[in-house]
């Protein structure tokens, strides 16, 4: 049997580097020559395609990983040829075998000559591109992100999705469910593709086959069209969920529904939930709350989600660019930029133009004009969303019309006249304008004048050619004329506005153009024959069509013949409009990508919105339609959080992409502010929705809301077309890579956050496996590769070093150390004795993830235990346990395989209740207590633990006589963290070194399988007779059931045959050699007692004399008695431990445990019996004294069996004291204090009286325990029905004087608690003080017991 070594010092580390290199080279060449071997590691490695005859190809890039995996796999099994093959984590790593099978192979570290460091030339598993098969970039980017989802990739690549799936039969008549596509072929192809990426065996054929299967199952993905990556991601996850759900139904497995759900919460409808791995990993729930504005009642709806689609906060304004046409003799235009709100009316645009140009709003006319002339006119009531940034908007400044009081402001006219003076000189100023004349005349009119109503505003533009093919030229302008103006004057006014465009020598004699009125209906021209053309009905109709806002106006188009235009005008094609400074400012402000944070996106997502009037909701309380307010909020969170940024928007008929920069954290995304704050009562409501992700309790770990980024899907381009890439963080080397189809480039962390990010993949920090490079506890690249799941891919040889290391250092190891089976871990701890305990629990291991179903599932270290995915799948496979219950290792493995599944099932119960339930229910069927133990579910032991520590503090305060000695150890134990308290106390009991069993030791004769019944039946019989088991809760019952078994276990540990001194292995002990010496000394002093069953009240003069004889050996014996009796309590009466199941000639473990556990009134009682009857055992005593080092590794197999059969082995010593035993302990301490005080007053008669009074209250309990001993004789096996001659007589002594027995129990308990509450061995000085106090107590107990023994 190989010995478990610490990390870094295994047998492979001792081998020379040269031998390993040559061995790995030979192994690699042989594997290549045979084509990688059937099922060998080479079958899944990159070396298979290489040429077997080329020596240079053996050192190629693609073959490096295969050689490393082969070497590690073979080196780990040089010493264990018969190991079972690795099944990818689906089953336990322990090989099946009989009860006496050797311990599983050790977990050595990587070889001494590590692989060369990864560089750019060496391939990294998972870093491989995907071929683009025609616009499949959306598929490639999504697959790369899923491939780097650690737990999902492990689940697919290791084939764990096949658990429980029936083998496909070739029978054509087999029902196909959904047809050919109903057999999970999408999941199968996805698993093949992911496996090829991580084994570096990818070829374009893999992705081509996957696309073919996808197109076969989803018609929309046929062809080479572009698609949205988020839509494909949701489709793929949903399809994998359906495939897994279909396989579960085919296998006949019941849905993963908590069995106690309907029992605890009967209200509300109940429905079965088929939970799959996709749901457990990606799915969570959000809550939609609808609040009535009248009665404030709230209606909640809960819905699941796989992906959160977050809106991107948009800027509150958007830019619009308007060309302003100023009023004046010469048309002066300028382009300005204004910011308008996202929603509103055109009045906001008019106000913005007015603020920018200082023109009054009632003098601004907004129209739309393109190359062919006028189009729309805008009024104030028009929707602003109908005006887009690319529209050509013109704002005409019109002259101010007469106000009601008849005052006309000439601001615009004078301003533009000044501009005309500067620009065009005095020649133009000398021309008389009818408009200016009319304005001057109007200014002098009386307030009652109606002259203003006779004027009309004309918006004029020029257009070459007639009909629909014309094109606008020149600048538009404004005319303010009388309605009754004649045709000739109208023609002159138009030519006057265009005079500076005319050639200098041209003299116009006749009308060269025609006038067209832009009306609502049809095309209407003004004829020259009309005396007053502006009085035409079409003009009146155009004026009436103008909406509110601005000045009423008429749009005229002056249409010129092309030859006439070329003859009269010059430079008409150069229509230059300057831009104001505001245009540049608005472009910089709005066209640059807006920056926001991911937290702002969540705030916008959870923002309260008011329902529209059309969506009014009938309140069930008010019975009326109400415009309620709706709020979305996150109710639960998944382990893998997928966030989709809504970059694509549909605005009417236009679709656009938001290029906003969303800043997201790479690590430490805290989701606490975005999760619903729940009260105590709301955690359990409602009962009918989603039991797979129901929240429990208020004591959630804050780490559950912390997420780290591991992948980003990017979209480059616009809404019409673009390209997808993926940024992923590799779990082997922890580096970021950019996957652009088949091109892969390394990326720095600063380059991950870009404005092209589209889908974000976050992983819960507590769900990151320990083997991942993304974990905070992960080691170097080589060590993480050794523990990575890639090393356990199908096709590898018997469980490789990486498989063994990861499987034992992860969920199974952490599970067994944190909750169950601590005693059996001594055989295969995988180096945990030298490794911090927190690592194995805080981080998950292979195929394991944090159990978030129950936040109350916290172990004694205030951490939630890790449930192995392999353990869940093992139970889901519905196969019986393949281990016989005789071996502690196998029972531990089979029990652990079923713990995680049941813990996820019973989400409404504390994990401890489930663990106690399973640890007992999966014992051997012959154990009679297993059926009763199966019902032990109730309140979590956290409350029990609080009560225990409270009782311990009370007991410490009562113990005033030995407060100096007790306070040191008790205070030390209180200061220590939980990891050094309960676990080490348990290790002192059951953590026996089983790695050094010597075949020649006499202990080998004690066969564990010969006594399973007695050890299993004692807890049952004791529990049945316990009077305190009626009024207590079921967890306390389960705790008490474990105590008698632990008593027998402890006795077998502490009082084995003299040849096995039985050292106690403590992981935190500073000196191992010192513990061995002490244990051997204890063994020589303890195991020399000839009496198999020392009575509780045996206090002969010889034993009293031996107390007074001081010797170093007695001090060691006293320390041993105090140190090893770690988990016994006052309730462990001597009755169950008195009947020894072993023959007297072989081992006196249980019989002698009575003298150590029951009496303890005299430390010298063992010594006295040893001196009187040490002749038969003297050779063994000398052997034990001489062979200290050899005896340190020996053990009694029955002790392991006792710890295995005990349903509550891992319940710590503090948890083993219930209220009944605490009452007895208090009475014992009180009697002890009284005895000691009265002894100091040297009043022996009074001492006897007080002791009898103090012990009278517990006589019935001790007598009843004696009756239990009598009743339990019928349960003993035939080998155990050979009591010694003096056993019966000594039991009668117990019934005669119960008070003194309580005192002796008190002595043991006080000395025991002072040593074990600290969690670690005390210093030499502290140990001596503890020994002195135990000697004083024992002598005081003897002195007080003398008067009570005289009548006997």
From Swiss-Prot:
Work out whether the entry's keyword set contains Acetylation.
yes
* Active site: residue positions: 137 (nucleophile), 723 (proton acceptor)
Q: How is it modified after translation?
A: Acetylated at Lys-1264. Acetylation decreases activity. Deacetylated by SIRT1.
Q: Which residue numbers delimit the USP domain?
A: 128-765
Locate the compositionally biased regions of type Polar residues: 958-970, 1160-1181, 1278-1290, 1341-1352
UniProt entry tagged with the keyword Acetylation? yes
- Where are the compositionally biased (Low complexity) regions? 1-16, 44-62, 992-1001, 1051-1070, 1078-1089, 1101-1138, 1198-1210, 1251-1264
Provide any one GO MF term from the record: cysteine-type deubiquitinase activity
Indicate, by first and last residue, each region the UniProt record lists as having compositional bias (Pro residues). 95-117
Which E.C. number(s) belong to this protein? 3.4.19.12
Segments for region (Disordered): 1-62, 79-119, 162-185, 812-835, 919-939, 951-1352
Q: What class of enzyme is it?
A: hydrolase
Give the reaction(s) catalysed.
Answer: Thiol-dependent hydrolysis of ester, thioester, amide, peptide and isopeptide bonds formed by the C-terminal Gly of ubiquitin (a 76-residue protein attached to proteins as an intracellular targeting signal)
Q: Where is the composition biased (Basic and acidic residues)?
A: 1148-1159, 1215-1225, 1234-1243
| Name under which the protein is recorded | Ubiquitin carboxyl-terminal hydrolase 31
State the organism named in the record.
Homo sapiens (Human)
């Amino acid at each position: 049997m190989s010995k478990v070594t610490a990390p870094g010092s295994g047998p492979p580390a001792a081998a020379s580097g040269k031998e390993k290199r040559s061995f790995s080279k030979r192994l690699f060449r042989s594997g290549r020559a045979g084509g990688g071997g059937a099922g060998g590691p080479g079958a899944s490695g990159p070396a298979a395609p290489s040429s077997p005859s080329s020596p240079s190809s053996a050192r190629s890039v693609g073959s490096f990983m295969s050689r490393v995996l082969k070497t590690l796999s073979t080196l780990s099994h040089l010493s264990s040829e018969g190991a079972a093959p690795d099944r990818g984590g689906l089953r336990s790593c322990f090989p099946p075998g009989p009860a006496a099978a050797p311990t599983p192979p050790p977990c050595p570290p990587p070889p001494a000559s590590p692989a060369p460091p990864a560089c750019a030339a060496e391939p990294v598993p998972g870093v491989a591109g995907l071929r683009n098969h025609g616009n499949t970039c959306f598929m490639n980017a999504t697959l790369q992100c899923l491939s780097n989802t650690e737990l999902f990739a492990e689940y697919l690549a290791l084939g764990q999705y096949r658990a429980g799936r029936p083998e496909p039969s070739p029978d054509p008549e087999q029902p196909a469910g959904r047809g050919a596509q109903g057999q999970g072929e999408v999941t199968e192809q996805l698993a093949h593709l992911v496996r090829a990426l991580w084994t570096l065996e990818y070829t374009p054929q893999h992705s081509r086959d996957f696309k073919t299967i996808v197109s076969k199952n989803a018609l929309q993905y046929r062809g080479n069209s572009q698609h949205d990556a988020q839509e494909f991601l949701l489709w793929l996850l949903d399809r994998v969920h359906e495939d897994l759900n279909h396989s579960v139904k085919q296998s006949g497995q019941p849905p993963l529904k908590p069995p106690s759900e309907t029992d605890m919460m009967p209200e509300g409808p109940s429905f079965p939930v088929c939970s799959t791995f996709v749901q457990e990993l990606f799915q969570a729930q959000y809550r939609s709350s609808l609040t009535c504005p009248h009665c404030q009642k709230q209606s909640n709806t809960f819905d699941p989600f796989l992906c959160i689609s977050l809106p991107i906060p948009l800027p509150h304004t958007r830019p619009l660019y308007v060309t302003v046409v100023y009023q004046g003799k010469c048309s002066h235009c300028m382009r300005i930029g204004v910011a308008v709100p996202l929603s509103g009316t055109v009045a906001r645009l008019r106000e913005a133009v007015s603020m920018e140009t200082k023109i009054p709003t009632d003098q601004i006319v907004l129209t739309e004009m393109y190359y062919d002339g006028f189009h729309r006119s805008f009024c104030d009531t028009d929707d602003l969303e109908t005006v887009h940034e690319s529209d050509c908007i013109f704002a005409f400044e019109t002259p101010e019309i007469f106000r009601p009081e008849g005052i006309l402001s000439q601001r615009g006219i004078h301003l533009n006249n000044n501009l005309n003076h500067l620009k065009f000189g005095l020649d133009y100023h000398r021309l008389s304008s009818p408009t200016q004349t009319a304005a001057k005349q109007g200014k002098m009119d009386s307030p009652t004048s109606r002259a203003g109503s006779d004027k009309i505003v004309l918006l004029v533009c020029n257009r070459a050619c007639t009909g629909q093919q014309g094109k606008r030229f020149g600048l538009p302008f404004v005319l303010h004329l009388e309605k009754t103006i004649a045709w000739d004057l109208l023609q002159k006014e138009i030519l006057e506005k265009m005079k500076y465009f005319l050639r200098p020598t041209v003299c116009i004699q006749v009308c060269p153009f025609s006038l067209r009125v832009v009306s609502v209906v049809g095309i209407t021209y003004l004829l020259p024959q009309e005396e007053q053309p502006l009085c035409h009905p079409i003009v009146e109709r155009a004026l009436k069509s103008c909406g509110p806002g601005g000045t009423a106006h008429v749009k005229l188009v002056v249409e010129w013949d092309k030859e006439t235009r070329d003859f009269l005008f010059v430079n008409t094609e150069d229509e230059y409009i300057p831009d104001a400074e505001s245009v540049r400012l608005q472009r910089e402000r709005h066209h640059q990508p807006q920056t926001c944070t991911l937290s702002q996106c969540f705030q916008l997502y959870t923002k309260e919105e008011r329902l529209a009037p059309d969506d009014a909701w009938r309140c069930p309380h008010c019975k009326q339609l109400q415009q309620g307010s709706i709020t979305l909020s996150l109710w639960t969170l998944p382990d893998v959080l997928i966030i989709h940024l809504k970059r694509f928007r549909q605005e009417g008929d236009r679709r656009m992409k938001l290029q906003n920069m969303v800043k997201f954290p790479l690590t430490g995304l805290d989701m606490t502010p975005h999760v619903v704050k729940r009260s105590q009562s709301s955690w359990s409501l409602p009962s009918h929705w989603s039991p797979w992700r129901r929240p429990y309790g208020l004591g959630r770990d804050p780490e559950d809301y912390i997420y780290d980024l591991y992948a980003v899907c990017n979209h480059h381009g616009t809404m019409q077309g673009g390209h997808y890439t993926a940024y992923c963080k590799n779990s082997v080397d922890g580096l970021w890579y950019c996957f652009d189809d088949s091109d892969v480039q390394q990326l720095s962390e600063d380059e991950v956050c870009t404005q092209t990010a589209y889908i974000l993949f976050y992983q819960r920090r507590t769900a990151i496996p320990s083997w991942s490079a993304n974990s905070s506890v992960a080691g170097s690249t080589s060590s993480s590769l050794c523990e990575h799941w890639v090393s356990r891919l199908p096709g590898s040889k018997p469980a490789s070093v990486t498989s063994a290391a990861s499987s034992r250092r992860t969920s199974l190891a952490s599970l067994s150390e944190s909750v169950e089976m601590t005693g059996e871990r001594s055989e295969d701890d995988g180096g945990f004795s030298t490794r911090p305990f927190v690592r194995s629990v805080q981080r998950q291991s292979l195929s394991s993830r944090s159990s978030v179903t129950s936040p109350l599932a916290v172990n004694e270290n205030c951490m939630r235990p890790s449930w192995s995915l392999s353990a869940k799948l093992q139970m889901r496979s519905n196969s019986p346990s393949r281990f016989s219950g005789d071996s502690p290792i196998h029972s531990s493995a089979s029990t652990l395989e079923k713990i995680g599944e049941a813990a996820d099932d019973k989400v409404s119960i504390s994990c401890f209740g489930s663990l106690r339930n399973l640890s007992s229910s999966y014992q051997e069927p012959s154990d009679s207590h297993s059926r009763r133990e199966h019902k032990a579910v109730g309140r979590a032991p956290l409350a029990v633990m609080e009560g225990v520590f409270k009782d311990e503090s009370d007991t410490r305060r009562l113990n005033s006589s030995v407060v100096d000695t007790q306070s040191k150890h008790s205070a030390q134990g209180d200061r220590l963290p939980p990891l050094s308290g309960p676990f080490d106390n348990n290790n002192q009991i059951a953590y026996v070194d089983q790695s050094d069993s010597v075949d020649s030791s006499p202990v080998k004769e004690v066969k564990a399988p010969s006594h399973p019944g007695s050890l299993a039946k004692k807890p049952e019989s004791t529990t049945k007779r316990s009077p305190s088991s009626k009024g207590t809760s079921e967890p306390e019952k389960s705790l008490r059931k474990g105590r008698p078994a632990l008593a027998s276990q402890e006795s077998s540990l502490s009082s084995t045959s003299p040849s096995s001194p039985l050292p106690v292995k403590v992981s935190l002990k500073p000196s191992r050699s010192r513990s061995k010496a002490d244990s051997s000394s204890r063994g020589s002093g303890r195991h020399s007692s000839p009496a198999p069953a020392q009575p509780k009240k045996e206090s002969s003069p010889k034993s009293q004399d031996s107390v007074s004889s001081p010797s170093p050996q007695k001090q060691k014996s006293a320390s041993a008695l105090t140190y090893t009796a770690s988990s016994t309590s006052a309730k462990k009466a001597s009755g169950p431990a008195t009947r020894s199941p072993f023959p007297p000639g072989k081992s006196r473990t249980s019989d002698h445990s009575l003298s150590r556990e029951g009496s303890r009134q005299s430390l010298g009682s063992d010594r006295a019996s040893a001196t009187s009857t040490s002749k038969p055992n003297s050779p063994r005593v000398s052997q034990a004294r001489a062979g200290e080092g050899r005896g340190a590794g020996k053990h009694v197999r029955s002790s392991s069996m006792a710890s295995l059969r005990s349903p509550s082995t891992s319940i710590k010593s503090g948890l083993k004291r219930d209220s009944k035993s605490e009452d007895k302990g208090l009475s014992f301490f009180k009697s002890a204090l009284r005895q000691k005080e009265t002894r100091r007053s040297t009043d022996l008669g009074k001492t006897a009286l007080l002791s009898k009074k103090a012990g009278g209250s517990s006589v019935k309990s001790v007598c009843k325990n004696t009756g239990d001993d009598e009743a339990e004789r019928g349960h003993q096996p035939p080998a155990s029905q050979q009591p010694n001659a003096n056993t019966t007589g000594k039991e009668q002594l117990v019934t005669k004087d119960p008070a003194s027995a309580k005192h002796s129990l008190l002595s043991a308990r006080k000395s025991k608690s002072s040593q074990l509450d600290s969690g670690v061995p005390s210093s030499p000085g502290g140990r001596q003080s503890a020994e002195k106090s135990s000697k004083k107590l024992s002598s005081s107990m003897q002195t007080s017991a003398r008067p009570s023994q005289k009548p006997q």
